[in-house]
Amino acid sequence: MFKGAIVAIVTPFKNGEIDEPALRDLIEFQIENGTDGIVPCGTTGESATLSHEEHDRVIEITIDAVRKRVPVIAGTGSNSTVEAMRLTKHAHEAGADGVLVVAPYYNRPTQEGLYQHYKALAESVPIPIIPYNIPSRTGVNILPETVARLAKISNIVGIKEASGSLKQMNDVIRLCDDGFSVLSGDDFFTLPLLTLGGKGVISVISNVAPADMACLVDAFEAGNMKKARAMHDKMVPLVDALFIETNPTPVKAALALMGKISEDVRLPLYRMTETSREKLKRVMQNYGLIG
């Protein structure tokens, strides 16, 4: 079962190319600070602007750098089922422990189309699959009843839920067996989802504060709700600041302020405004991440 504090890791760039040394350093930073798993090539990893070759390479680098210390769940989604199959097959052959597959975007399939998309993937590659529901980006919502159907497929093992609806998340948990991992796709909903029976989070804030998100999840699992609530409250201002502009622009700016990477993003994403940067910087100073 995939659970705990899992990071949706950024893809660092330098002079327009993947910065492999920086990516390897980020992975060490994550593992040293208690992260339970790493997701390369997700939304936060700018998968949409990676070439096919770069996408494959980022996954390979991550698997090599992690060295089986924590699970690697590779982002392999596409709005083409055939392309998602290719990406998923590569991740499996490269040694990924699982794949995160965003719902097909732009073409807006029906619920039956979504079911058949994931079913075809599951039948084509023998790897644990986590569908990713984020209607605000994809234009389609994987409904709880569809998730319940998917959960009956043996290698569809969980879902990253970013619908923004706790009611929907609760319905998914209610309709699926306890072994099905419902993971928050929104840092703010991590603690509320855990209280409903969720298993963890695929996190953006973990890029900059991995120990704190790991602490929240560990405290909850240990039954220390007071500590879990304190960590939640501590992180809320930073979560807000990391979404002051389109993800992953702010989190890359934050990592740059911490001296870990260049803040380069690829067009059509663009660097932060100075107003947003100053707001982010103040929050990070108050949080203790920078001086």
Swiss-Prot record:
Active-site residue list: Y132 (proton donor/acceptor), K160 (schiff-base intermediate with substrate)
Record-listed E.C. numbers: 4.3.3.7
SMART domains for this protein: DHDPS
Reaction equations catalysed: L-aspartate 4-semialdehyde + pyruvate = (2S,4S)-4-hydroxy-2,3,4,5-tetrahydrodipicolinate + H2O + H(+)
Pfam families: DHDPS
Superkingdom of source: Bacteria
Family matches, as SUPFAM superfamilies: Aldolase
Molecular functions per Gene Ontology: 4-hydroxy-tetrahydrodipicolinate synthase activity
Site entry (Part of a proton relay during catalysis), positions: T43, Y106
Gene Ontology terms describing biological process: diaminopimelate biosynthetic process; lysine biosynthetic process via diaminopimelate
Residue sites binding pyruvate per the record: T44, I202
Coiled-coil positions: none
Cystine residue pairs: none
Compartment(s): Cytoplasm
Pathway it works in: Amino-acid biosynthesis; L-lysine biosynthesis via DAP pathway; (S)-tetrahydrodipicolinate from L-aspartate: step 3/4
UniProt family annotation: Belongs to the DapA family.
Primary role: Catalyzes the condensation of (S)-aspartate-beta-semialdehyde [(S)-ASA] and pyruvate to 4-hydroxy-tetrahydrodipicolinate (HTPA).
Record text on subunit structure and interactions: Homotetramer; dimer of dimers.
NCBIfam families: dapA
Official protein name in the record: 4-hydroxy-tetrahydrodipicolinate synthase
Source organism per UniProt: Syntrophus aciditrophicus (strain SB)
Classification lineage: Bacteria, Pseudomonadati, Thermodesulfobacteriota, Syntrophia, Syntrophales
Gene: dapA
